[in-house]
Amino acid sequence: MKMAKAWISFLLLILAVTVCIGCSHVDKTDVEGVITNELNLLKNLDSDTVHKYVAYEELFPDVKGKAELSNEVEEVFSLFFKDFDYKILEIDVGQDKMSATARLKLSTLDTKALAKDYDTAHLEDAILSAASGSDENPDSLESRYLILNELLKNRQYDTVETDCSMELKNTGTDTEEWEIVRTYDLENNLVGGLMTYLSDSDLLTPEETLTVYLNTLKTMDLNQMSNYLGIESLLNTSDEAKSSIAAALVEQVHNNFDFKISGSDIQSYKATVNTELTTFDSSTILETYQNELTEYLNSPDAVIDGSQKRYEHSLELLLKNIEENTVTVTSPVSFYLINDGVSWKLTDESQSLSSGIFGNLVSTPVAEDMDGYEDGSEEEYSEDDSYEEDDSSYEE
């Protein structure tokens, strides 16, 4: 009799364990079904599901206000999730069956590379917008998404795998109804950490940031360079002769300007980036111009020509020497950047860039009034009166 009771107890224990295991398996299957359904919708580019987990504003939380978004913006998430994939590694259901945790492996785009490309393109747009005096806001939500759209359409990014945990809760009463708990970490994981990278103020280093500034400068036209570098006295003019000189100088920049970064020093939110700048040799241009001008002013023609013609001929000589120049010079120039908590930014860029690129030609050496040359003498142009580069660092 005792033996029979023991067997009955043992069988009941086995049955209870089996039932528990079965229930646990059912619970895990239910949880897995919810996860699979939701993530498959992401894979299939269901816009409602995308917006459910990633709101437009959450990628760029610093942008204030809302705006209607174009079809190109809608397309960003379709392009982003086209290679999205996942694998459920483990599911753990709580004993009270009210919560569950799932561990997954997600396959997403290399969002660090995407974010660095975005930061580069966004900075380029901001620089050119400032140089053009454009009314368009490069920091608007739509402008930012249009950059992402262009990058995702025109560039190929590798896929990377990351581990992700997901929390679920049972919202049912009579029957189990599992629901994925939306959190910042989950949203960030679903987009491969893009939210973290886009908010990283150090994603572009000071050296990389300066590289964007200098490369963008190479692409500027006459008006953009004039506005951006703040040298309107030389480049921004309605005078036809001076306009020709300004255009020739910009052409010299396009043909000769280059740079090499030799090192950097970062102290907290301040950085110094040392470079070797190569540009046209303004000193050679001025020396040749001054010699030819002296020869002309000492000639009888200068007296006969009168003040206005002497002025016009001086401009012609300067233009000729700029256009014919093939001499370059390489000089060390230090640039200073500050991290404002959003990104690294070049400080006093107009002053440091204009002096580094144009040297002594940051202002015209041609005197407006040539009356002082009536007796054949000349008023020497002094480099001491020219723009002096300020090598002083920011104050600590």
Question: What is each residue range found by the language model?
Answer:
Residues A113, T120-S201, E295-K309, E323-E374:
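Short beta-strand edge/turn micro-motifs at domain boundaries
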Residues L217-Q224, S268, D281, L293, ...:
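Charged, low-complexity helical/coil segments in non-catalytic cytosolic or luminal regions
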Residues V54, Y86-I88, L168, F259-I261, ...:
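Fold-core signature of tandem repeat domains
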Residues V19-G22:
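C-terminal motif of bacterial Sec signal peptides marking the signal peptidase cleavage site
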Residues M1-F10:
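Bacterial N-terminal signal peptides that target proteins for export
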Residues N71-L151, I245-N321, D375-E396:
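Surface-exposed, charged secondary-structure patches
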Residues H25-L79, D83, V191-I261, T284-L286:
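Core segments of small alpha/beta cavity-forming domains
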Residues S9-V17:
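Hydrophobic helical h-region of N-terminal Sec-dependent signal peptides
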